[in-house]
Amino acid sequence: MNQLEMKKLAAQAALQYVKADTIVGVGSGSTVNCFIEALGTIKDKIQGAVAASKESEELLRKQGIEVFNANDVSSLDIYVDGADEINPQKMMIKGGGAALTREKIVAALAKKFICIVDSSKQVDVLGSTFPLPVEVIPMARSQVGRKLVALGGSPEYREDVVTDNGNVILDVHNFSILNPVEMEKELNNVSGVVTNGIFALRGADVVIVGTPEGAKIID
């Protein structure tokens, strides 16, 4: 079974958490694209969705699913998103697709965060296999980069990428994130940082892992 098939298994399994007549929070990325496709099969059951990226908005509309603005909803029943890494405590690194800020906003609206991944995304320590994305106000890029170096990281400017919010991304290598909650707070306090890709303060409630043996649910 290849990686795409495992992603589809996890995405399909997430449908069991979708309740009738609700608005579903939807993240972004390749695994979420599989979920959007699956969500299209039950589009008449739901009111619609709030999307964390413009790309996800477009895909939802192609499926005939109404897209709501985050400002027009007070809460969401569930938020479904993928991860670049996830640890046993259900904390994640996200932002490979540069949608991390909007993902945090939509996740904060949800009563339940459901993370869908394939088994390659599971790690013991965050930062083991994937650099940490940090969204930065453009004029602060160099200043934030120096601060990240002082904290022990090796930031790399993600060239030719502008976020949906008009900002830039620094990918920080060589961070072994032993205390994700404290690291998330510390980085978010750096002037010029919009947010970083650690999802620890608001981690996942349920993790669905696509494996060669099927979808494994961790709650």
Swiss-Prot record:
Pfam families: Rib_5-P_isom_A (PF06026). It comes from the Bacteria. Substrate binds at residues 28-31, 81-84, 94-97, 121. It is an enzyme of class 5 (isomerase). Its EC number is 5.3.1.6. Pathway: Carbohydrate degradation; pentose phosphate pathway; D-ribose 5-phosphate from D-ribulose 5-phosphate (non-oxidative stage): step 1/1. It catalyses: aldehydo-D-ribose 5-phosphate = D-ribulose 5-phosphate. InterPro entries: NagB/RpiA_transferase-like (IPR037171), Ribose5P_isomerase_typA_subgr (IPR020672), Ribose5P_isomerase_type_A (IPR004788). One of its GO terms (molecular function) is ribose-5-phosphate isomerase activity. Gene3D superfamilies: 3.30.70.260, 3.40.50.1360. GO terms for cellular component: cytosol. Keywords: Isomerase. GO terms for biological process: D-ribose metabolic process; pentose-phosphate shunt, non-oxidative branch. The active site is at residue 103. Coiled coil: none annotated. Homodimer. Belongs to the ribose 5-phosphate isomerase family. Catalyzes the reversible conversion of ribose-5-phosphate to ribulose 5-phosphate. PANTHER family: RIBOSE-5-PHOSPHATE ISOMERASE. This is Ribose-5-phosphate isomerase A. It comes from Haemophilus influenzae (strain PittGG). The lineage of its organism: Bacteria, Pseudomonadati, Pseudomonadota, Gammaproteobacteria, Pasteurellales.
